[in-house]
Amino acid sequence: MDTSRLTLDHFLSRFQLLRPQMTHETLNQRQAAVLIPVVRRPQPGLLLTQRAIHLRKHAGQVAFPGGAVDSTDASLIAAALREAQEEVAIPPQAVEVIGVLPPVDSVTGFQVTPVVGIIPPNLPWRASEDEVSAVFEMPLAQALQLGRYHPLDVYRRGNSHRVWLSWYEHYFVWGMTANILRELALQIGVKP
């Protein structure tokens, strides 16, 4: 599938036509969720954040809004929506949730569920200075081009695992964020 002329309608029909498949058994028990905010435009965008520099984990990294499930969350989707509101001021009622991708294990011990949602183009999002240093929009068509991601095999604690790397403007997109974007591309039928 060629992503260069990806429209929102095409993305939605492909995402809903091909249901996510579980690819592996997850190892982690702690639950987290992220929102993949697709901006409703004829040529859709993808909202991403850069985590604040002062954070203990993943400081300065490009990420989706999201975080750990807490006791007030009724579901993984509710957790993703709450975190998106806390981090970038996206009201939960403004998000049209279209589905979820299979959970991914993080290196920090969480089972992370990506929630795909459509958001209006005119939302006045703003970064929570406690958690986010920047909010930016990337064209979804570019984010879903598999050729932009390059593999790097990392050896950690005697184990090898592959991470994916890419750049968008001056933002370095890698790790779980790049992996989730690749999974989303594969989900809608982009060929490697």
Curated annotation (Swiss-Prot):
Ligand binding (Mg(2+)): E83, E87
Function of the protein: Probably mediates the hydrolysis of some nucleoside diphosphate derivatives.
Keywords on record: Hydrolase, Magnesium, Manganese, Metal-binding
Transmembrane regions listed in the UniProt entry: none
Species classification: Bacteria, Pseudomonadati, Pseudomonadota, Gammaproteobacteria, Enterobacterales
Full protein name: Uncharacterized Nudix hydrolase NudL
Family: Belongs to the Nudix hydrolase family. PCD1 subfamily.
E.C. code: 3.6.1.-
CDD domains to which the protein is assigned, alphabetical: NUDIX_CoAse_Nudt7
Organism field: Salmonella typhimurium (strain LT2 / SGSC1412 / ATCC 700720)
Keyword Disulfide bond listed: no
GO molecular function per UniProt: coenzyme A diphosphatase activity; magnesium ion binding; manganese ion binding
Biological process, per Gene Ontology: nucleoside diphosphate metabolic process
Cofactor list: Mn(2+); Mg(2+)
